């Protein structure tokens, strides 16, 4: 048994412009090869594009997109007597938010388009409408969980 005790919870810092934790989480997921200033540029340009197109607060659109994509249930592989089952598990809110951000960025990267800011803004706007690849990923996960509901007792 470990003698260290429970790990301290890290406080998520806020980004300098919007003063929001979710924006900072998104920036840290956009980040590649330690180029944080580029990640800031990408996100702020995407937010500016959203502001120009929708004439609304881009932060509220971001929150709404994340809320729409956030899953409540996921599937986890579990080996039971030699065979692997996809077991549906409930997800807590913070983990769901992390998954939503990851899915939004994955979908934005796969999108055809000019640059990452354009692709990210388009994906966020589609997610608020209930469309886009991130929403499709959530629905696919829910379908998997529904199909494997019989294995829920293997948790």
UniProtKB/Swiss-Prot annotation:
SUPFAM superfamilies to which the protein is assigned, alphabetical = Ribosomal protein S7
* Localization annotation: Plastid, Chloroplast
Report the superkingdom from the record.
Eukaryota
Q: Which GO terms describe its cellular component?
A: chloroplast; small ribosomal subunit
Against CDD domains, the record matches this protein to: uS7_Chloroplast (cd14871)
InterPro entries for this protein:
Ribosomal_uS7, Ribosomal_uS7_bac/org-type, Ribosomal_uS7_CS, Ribosomal_uS7_dom, Ribosomal_uS7_dom_sf
- State whether keyword Plastid applies: yes
Q: What Pfam families does its record include?
A: Ribosomal_S7 (PF00177)
What molecular functions are annotated in GO for this chain?
Answer: rRNA binding; structural constituent of ribosome
| GO BP terms in the entry | translation
> Which UniProt keywords are given for this protein, alphabetically ordered?
Chloroplast, Plastid, Ribonucleoprotein, Ribosomal protein, RNA-binding, rRNA-binding
Q: Write down the Gene3D superfamilies for this protein, in alphabetical order.
A: Ribosomal protein S7 domain
Family membership:
Belongs to the universal ribosomal protein uS7 family.
Task: Describe its function.
Answer: One of the primary rRNA binding proteins, it binds directly to 16S rRNA where it nucleates assembly of the head domain of the 30S subunit.
Which proteins does it associate with, and in what oligomeric form? Part of the 30S ribosomal subunit.
What's the protein name? Small ribosomal subunit protein uS7cz/uS7cy
The gene it comes from is rps7-A
